[in-house]
Amino acid sequence: MAQYKGAASEAGRAMHLMKKREKQREQMEQMKQRIAEENIMKSNIDKKFSAHYDAVEAELKSSTVGLVTLNDMKAKQEALVKEREKQLAKKEQSKELQMKLEKLREKERKKEAKRKISSLSFTLEEEEEGGEEEEEAAMYEEEMEREEITTKKRKLGKNPDVDTSFLPDRDREEEENRLREELRQEWEAKQEKIKSEEIEITFSYWDGSGHRRTVKMRKGNTMQQFLQKALEILRKDFSELRSAGVEQLMYIKEDLIIPHHHSFYDFIVTKARGKSGPLFNFDVHDDVRLLSDATVEKDESHAGKVVLRSWYEKNKHIFPASRWEPYDPEKKWDKYTIR
């Protein structure tokens, strides 16, 4: 004799709809969480880089006292940058591990809820959902396979309640090293391109009066290379230079005696200034100290002087040689002066 099964079938359909709605709600929550995480990561990029370089600059200023050579300054700056990057890497590693633990706990809660729903609705769905059970079983197996693969990739086979922020993450370290190397190579390529650019240098051979010449150099050339080329140009016109070598010449720029090992690039990238004008321009304009307010930074500069060291020793008590002094990268010139 046939039996009426209407109530059981209606209850099964209702439970099936509830499960579908629960799954849709979980998917929406996951999408919202991913979008929020992406927005937070994007908004923190600029802050992270600016805070990183501000901290390095502050540490460099506080740890540098007195006169320091250019090489020592560069070495100290590189060491501070590396130390700061290690600190940031540790903080980022701790944050990522915390997020992974939160996601793992959330998955455990969802799986527990699914098990409770399945145990309650099993008897009601048994009569009419034979085909649906097979489909759900297949979906459940796929989900378990995905979770197993994800667990293997993330290496989260340990107790999620244990703090593992101090442990190294080889994958992330390799990615950070790769990115750091790419940025270093990109920066070096850009600097090499700048150094290879050609500039025209206007200079004056000074023996009590000026004799102007021009020569083309590259921004990466040193003062010694420049003086060698200038000497080749001047020898045919000045007999006292025919037996002179580069080590006997001095280069005076904006009343500062420039050491031979410095390059034009050093002054260009740092926008260095001298006593009477900028050191980063090597073409010539009228005297910037007489045209307008000499305290305002200008691009105009004076022709650098090429001088025999013997001439300087004899005349260093007489103007203009009396104004000349050795270049010191730590000394700042706030105003341009004539005397």
From Swiss-Prot:
Protein's cellular compartments: Nucleus
Effect listed in the UniProt record for changing residue 254 to G: In MRXSA; hypomorphic variant; does not fully rescue craniofacial patterning defects in zebrafish morphant embryos; does not affect FAM50A protein levels in patient cells; does not affect localization to the nucleus
Modified residues (N-acetylalanine): 2
Domain of life: Eukaryota
Family: Belongs to the FAM50 family.
Entry GO MF terms: RNA binding
Gene Ontology CC annotation, any one: nucleoplasm
Disordered: annotated span: 1-31, 121-177
Higher taxonomy: Eukaryota, Metazoa, Chordata, Craniata, Vertebrata
Protein name: Protein FAM50A
Result after altering residue 143 to K: It rescues craniofacial patterning defects in zebrafish morphant embryos
Record has Nucleus as a keyword: yes
Cited function: Probably involved in the regulation of pre-mRNA splicing.
Effect upon mutating residue 255 to G: In MRXSA; hypomorphic variant; does not fully rescue craniofacial patterning defects in zebrafish morphant embryos; does not affect localization to the nucleus
Segments forming a coiled coil: none
Gene source species: Homo sapiens (Human)
Record text on subunit structure and interactions: Interacts with EFTUD2, a component of the spliceosome U5 complex. Interacts with DDX41, a component of the spliceosome C complex.
Effect upon mutating residue 206 to G: In MRXSA; uncertain significance; does not affect FAM50A protein levels in patient cells; does not affect localization to the nucleus
GO BP annotation list: chromatin organization; mRNA processing; regulation of RNA splicing; RNA splicing; spermatogenesis
Residue(s) of cross-link: Glycyl lysine isopeptide (Lys-Gly) (interchain with G-Cter in SUMO2): 100
Bias type Acidic residues, positions: 124-146
Ranges of biased composition (kind: Basic and acidic residues): 168-177
Listed Pfam families: XAP5
Associated pathology: Intellectual developmental disorder, X-linked, syndromic, Armfield type: An X-linked recessive disorder characterized by global developmental delay with impaired intellectual development, walking difficulties and poor or absent speech. Affected individuals display a distinctive phenotype characterized by postnatal growth retardation, variable head circumference with a prominent forehead and dysmorphic facial features, ocular abnormalities, and seizures.
Motif (Nuclear localization signal): 152-155
Keywords of the record: Acetylation, Disease variant, Intellectual disability, Isopeptide bond, mRNA processing, mRNA splicing, Nucleus, Ubl conjugation
